[in-house]
Regions:
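C-terminal regulatory/interaction regions
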Residues: 1-6, 283-344
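Conserved beta-strand hairpin/beta-sheet module of binuclear metal-dependent hydrolase folds
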Residues: 10-70, 74, 203-214, 220
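Residues at alpha-helix caps and immediate loop-helix transition turns in enzyme cores, especially N-
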Residues: 35, 57-60, 90, 269, ...
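Metallo-beta-lactamase
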Residues: 45-46, 52-54, 151-174, 181, ...
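Active-site HxH/HxHxD metal-binding segment of metal-dependent hydrolases
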Residues: 56-58, 64-183, 210
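Aromatic/hydrophobic pocket-lining residues that form the small-molecule binding cavity
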Residues: 61, 239, 317
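Histidine-centered divalent metal-coordination motifs
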Residues: 79-87, 105, 195-197, 201, ...
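Short hydrophobic/aromatic-enriched beta-strand-loop microsegments
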Residues: 99-105, 213-215, 273, 309
Length: 344
């Protein structure tokens, strides 16, 4: 089992001087927990990525606070690294209950697209938590999201009012521009915009202490999902540039990711992630050469194992195909509402 998939424990770790890690339970493809970091200063506590919404998740979050030696009332700031539900989920409620500030990147999306992450398990029920009906939505490549069974559709519609509240993104109090500085937990952090996994992803770097809060941008053993949901975008190029950007930060000696365990060698990990995506681009090119002209869903089956087939695999395949196309290495045409790709 990869470390990002390990189930959450209630152990509280000091992962850098003055920075505590709390693991919160999570059920997403390949993920068993999200790391919530706590930084103490004279005003109280800053929390980074407080996990999922919902009563059960909230109860566990408050229990983790207690184990870490503080209470909800001590939280004055919540940092949200990006607009995915496992990172911002509890932030709005913390803001409401503790009158805390919410800090994001200046590009933070004030809406959430669940097709970025596929299914999540919410309060014991695996669902597609979108206030809309995702199975009615078209994809940029002309496909449709799978239509769930009737009982799931009915339950989904019944829960929609509650889900609309739970899955609302927070309104940021502070939007950090790239390279802007902010003092949190007795450290001065530099905002590092790192689009790729999402357009609004934020890392925080402490130059003096050598600590990087990397969110989902750099994970220890897996790569974050690169979604091709936004038509016309090239998130893979953005991701490569953002990898190089953090790799060039001077003096990083400790990386604190949102999933998995802290690690030290950022440069080596960035090289591994680059290599992984270059290998996938080569594999996709080989498949396209064999198939000739083909839709995204067909090419996706040559890039991912069968257990991973579905919307997430298709969106990442689309992102890689668009990267090839925009780089002049592939072409596409539309036929009956679907995009067909071929390599040059």
């Amino acid at each position: 089992m990869r470390q990002e998939a390990e189930p959450a424990t209630d152990e509280i770790d000091e992962v850098a001087p003055g920075i505590l890690r709390m693991q919160l339970p999570l059920r997403m493809p390949g993920l068993g927990h999200v790391n919530c970091y706590a930084l103490e200063d004279e005003r109280g506590m800053t929390i980074v990525d407080p996990g999922m919404p919902g009563p059960q998740a909230w109860k566990l979050l408050i229990e983790r606070f207690s184990l870490a030696g503080f209470q909800l009332k001590h939280v004055h700031t919540v940092v949200v690294t990006h607009s995915h539900i496992d990172h911002f989920g509890a932030s709005g409620r913390i803001r409401q209950k503790a009158n805390a500030n919410v800090v994001t990147s200046s590009t933070f999306r004030t809406w959430w697209d669940p097709t970025d992450v596929g299914e999540v398990e919410l309060e014991g029920e695996t669902q597609q938590p979108d206030p809309r009906e995702p199975w009615k939505m078209s994809t940029p490549w002309g496909g449709k999201h799978p239509r769930p069974p009737r009982r799931v559709r009915l339950k989904y519609r019944f829960l929609r009012p509650m889900m609309r509240r739970w899955f609302a993104t927070p309104s940021p109090s502070v939007r950090l521009a790239d390279a802007e500085r902010i003092t949190l937990g007795k450290r001065e952090w530099v905002s590092v915009h790192t689009p790729g996994h999402t357009p609004d992803h934020l890392c925080l770097f402490d130059p003096e202490g050598g600590v990087l809060l990397s969110g989902d941008h750099v994970l220890p053993t897996i790569t974050p999902h690169i979604s091709g949901i936004d038509a016309g975008a090239d998130p893979l190029t953005d991701f490569f540039a953002s990898l190089d950007k953090v790799s060039d930060l001077p003096g990083v000696t400790r990386v604190l990711p949102a999933h998995g365990h802290p690690f030290d060698d950022l440069t080596a990990r960035v090289k591994d992630i680059h290599r992984h995506h270059e290998e996938r681009l080569a594999k996709l090119t080989e498949a396209a050469e064999r198939l000739g002209e083909a839709p995204v869903e067909e090419l996706s089956k040559h890039l991912f194992r069968q257990r991973s087939w579905g919307p997430m695999a298709d969106s990442e395949t689309y992102a890689h195909l668009e990267h090839l196309r925009l780089g002049g290495k592939a072409s596409r045409r539309e036929e009956e509402g679907r995009l067909l790709y071929s390599v040059k």
